[in-house]
Curated annotation (Swiss-Prot):
Keyword annotations: Cell membrane, Membrane, Transmembrane, Transmembrane helix
GO CC field: plasma membrane
Pfam families assigned to the protein according to its UniProt record, in alphabetical order: TM2
Domain TM2, chain residue ranges per copy: 32-79
Protein name per its UniProtKB record: Uncharacterized protein MJ1516
Subcellular location: Cell membrane
Keyword rRNA-binding attached: no
Mode of membrane association: Multi-pass membrane protein
InterPro entries: TM2
Primary location: membrane
Length: 99
């Protein structure tokens, strides 16, 4: 499952292509998402972690079904996994070797 859409991936790749390693590190630190915030948001308001990660549609679905309890628990897990995936994908794009 893609954490970022293709347009965002291309924009980031194009933006960092002329950066040195230190600039890429700074850019990564600015762009990455907090796993803790994503989990906390989904714990407090199911689906809010997904919205924080830019997955608004999924967040709304989880919010509307959270009264079933299982989607709420899934929302917490998914926020954690999605934030980790987003950051890993961001890292691989920023620090790719094919520049």
């Amino acid at each position: 499952m893609m954490a970022m859409n293709e347009i965002e991936l291309m924009q980031i790749k194009d933006f960092v292509k002329d950066m040195d390693k230190n600039q890429r590190i700074v850019y990564y630190e600015q762009k990455k998402k907090s796993v803790g915030i994503a989990v906390l948001l989904s714990f407090i308001i199911p689906g809010a972690g997904q919205m924080y990660l830019g997955r608004v549609g999924k967040g709304i679905i989880l919010l509307l079904t959270c009264w079933l309890i299982i989607p709420w628990i899934y929302s917490i897990y998914d926020a954690y996994k999605s934030a980790k995936d987003y950051n890993a994908q961001l890292y691989s794009i920023i620090f790719s070797k094919d520049d």
